[in-house]
Amino acid sequence: ADALLYRNDAEFARFLPHIPQPFTKRDAEAFVALNMAEPWDRTPTFAVTLNRKVIGTVNLDVDVDSATAMLGYAIGRTWWGQGIATEAARAAIAWGGETFQLARIWASTDTRNVKSQRVLEKLGMRQESLKVCKHVGREGELVYEVVYGLTRNAIAP
């Protein structure tokens, strides 16, 4: 139910075209079922909670063979600007680095999503490249993503 509340927000989903708008109860149920079905040793997803309420998620998409992982996070708009995304992502990075002995963690975000870029910079990630995204934006526009990365020395807690 909490996922329905924070994900049913056009501004929240602005740079996340895979999240339908409006976000219905059926969408929320599918989101939870999908994340529960993902193998924990490859795609761990954590609920971000505040006062026993789910306000977002943070996840890693681990490639064990290359000892790398993609970081993802999404926090409800009500809680933006409070350092919660940074704190949750930092915890996931430390946990993933130790659990999987990762050599590199990376993340990408829409070039227009300055707030997300700021989170990645606060995590110590450095901009590595710019790429054309494989999906289009909500308005059918071409999307460019900036890729940030963190190597083993910076992953250690």
Label for each model-derived stretch:
Residues 1, 5-11, 47-157:
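Acyl-donor (CoA/ACP) binding surface of acyl/acetyltransferases
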Residues 12-34:
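Conserved GNAT-fold acetyl-CoA-binding loop/helix
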Residues 23-24, 39, 139, 155:
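A short hydrophobic/aromatic micro-motif that marks alpha-helical segments and, especially, helix-coil
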Residues 33-47, 56:
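A short helix-loop-beta-strand connector motif used in the catalytic cores of GNAT acetyltransferases and
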